[in-house]
Amino acid sequence: MSLGLVGRKVGMTRIFADDGRSIPVTVLDVSDNKVTQIKTPEADGYSAVQVAFGKRRASRVVKPIAGHLAKAGVEPSRVLKEFRVEPEGLASLKAGDQVSVEIFSVGQKVDVTGVSIGKGFSGPIKRHNFSSNRASHGNSVSHNSPGSIGMAQDPGRVFPGKRMAGQYGAVQRTTLGLEVVRVDAERQLLLVKGAVPGAKGGDVVVRPAIKA
């Protein structure tokens, strides 16, 4: 249970190590993370830090959230996220504080959560990597069909969880154990090795790796 950051996926690029190796990295903008609430075991039954990220017009924020943010002295924000932390980690934080990218360090492993790119309604071959049927030799109009999806009169139904056509992508996914390659404190940017879920401009959540 450690404090993390909410950010925006800027895109991918590469940087070069001292030995000339090309390292693919994803750039994450984690600027403007502000503490909106400190939750304590005495008042809330558990210890956590709530942070706000991103800007939003005041007219687009519902009144309960607007009041909650105003109480913390934070501008209208787009994302609210809560991180469970140990009670000892609450002492140095208070509402209105800005959380810096420097809570992470080069070489540290992090988990990044985002919403994967949506591909729309897709067939089972694209969605589940099924094999195509024969292109000819007796096959008619079922080249990309999934094949049998059930049995006979008993059980007389399609079992839940059967892999079939449907919405592909646009689901929350987490990539585990990405290495922090660079921490840019001046611009509040975090560069992690490899790809993270989601499209450019998508919101992501960065936490210290749970399996590190």
Curated annotation (Swiss-Prot):
Supply the source organism's classification: Bacteria, Pseudomonadati, Pseudomonadota, Betaproteobacteria, Rhodocyclales
Protein name as annotated: Large ribosomal subunit protein uL3
One molecular function GO term is:
structural constituent of ribosome
Species in which this protein is naturally found: Azoarcus sp. (strain BH72)
How would you describe the post-translational modification of this protein? Methylated by PrmB.
Query: What protein family does this chain belong to?
Result: Belongs to the universal ribosomal protein uL3 family.
NCBIfam families cross-referenced by the UniProt entry:
L3_bact
Keyword annotations from UniProtKB, A to Z? Methylation, Ribonucleoprotein, Ribosomal protein, RNA-binding, rRNA-binding
One BP annotation, GO:
translation
SUPFAM superfamilies, per database record: Translation proteins
Gene3D superfamilies named in the record: 3.30.160.810, Translation factors
Question: What would be one Pfam family of this protein?
Answer: Ribosomal_L3
Q: Which GO terms describe its cellular component?
A: cytosolic large ribosomal subunit
Location of N5-methylglutamine modifications: Q153
Which HAMAP family does the record cross-reference, listed alphabetically?
Ribosomal_uL3_B
Q: How does it assemble?
A: Part of the 50S ribosomal subunit. Forms a cluster with proteins L14 and L19.
* Recorded name of the encoding gene: rplC
Q: What does this protein do?
A: One of the primary rRNA binding proteins, it binds directly near the 3'-end of the 23S rRNA, where it nucleates assembly of the 50S subunit.
